[in-house]
């Protein structure tokens, strides 16, 4: 049985499409292992932080107004939780912080929620690109280890988390401030002596 060139092409493209998922899964698993190995936090602390982010977001979204009108992300580093996103008013902003504080394991809350409409998917994509650029610049800069700083971008604002020296914090902020599209850099560091 011979296959027409069009059928051969369809088979090849289908195979590539299905294998692409395997490649992404394999690379993702490798990236996760590398992250655990290079992050200064222990693997247990990293898992605790991921769990805490999930618990805080769940607790906050139990509020109907937040769930319907807000967009909130929780970012945790050593139990210190940063709230970012958009809410309709200051009352909802305060409610979100109060709900987050009530979650077991939360040591500190940094409420950086902004009052206004939810950002667009296009802005979310721009923020992801900003985060990628900041991390890449840190890798080549050398003044601060990129693995020591967690970088999150939200609506053009870059948030830097981690446990670093004052010099490293300043270097990280300097690097982030020079990236196109960055409106503001917010340091949420715990400082070493």
What does each model-identified segment do?
Residues 2-7, 13-193:
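N-terminal targeting leaders
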